[in-house]
């Protein structure tokens, strides 16, 4: 753990967790062994970060968020309060023979979230999903399929309703951002920045 990291006394940071410089971990959060959190992150209260989860630098994970084994967050990712990033598409408590599942019985299918994406409050992202950079997941959305870079998705199941700028504002019909003036174009179904 970096000397400049700040960990609340009620947080449970297990042995083998890597915490970067100037990262702050608030009350009652639990980071399990093998987890890695980059520099300049804020981990809110009561956050759960499971085994081997990777969190990039300059991320903000709000209160009560749950990041399960297999989750990888790029730099500058926002995870809203109560959001849940899962890791098992076919969960069961027991094996077909009726015995309780052990760690080795789980097939982990993690979630990958690229740089700058934002996941809204109480959104659920199922295992195996890839969230493109600078995308925006609406509050309460249930994401069952990959989200393209800059895509805005909402609902249950989540569906794309538009495109987001790097600054977070939605793009207009001409793919221009009213917030910062950036201009985009669609090329082979991918949004690319022109300026």
Where are these regions (language model features)?
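Basic/polar N-terminal segments that are highly enriched at the extreme N-terminus
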Residues: 1-2, 195
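Structural signal for interior beta-strand "rungs" in well-ordered beta-sheet cores
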Residues: 2-96, 100-154, 158-160, 166
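Intrinsically disordered, low-complexity terminal tails/loops enriched in metal-binding residues
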Residues: 115, 172-174
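Short, solvent-exposed secondary-structure boundary motifs
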Residues: 132, 174-177
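Cys/His-rich microdomains that often coordinate metals
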Residues: 160, 169-172, 183-186
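Short cysteine-rich clusters marking metal-coordination/redox-active sites
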Residues: 165, 177-180
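Short microdomains enriched in Cys/His and/or Lys/Arg
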Residues: 181-195
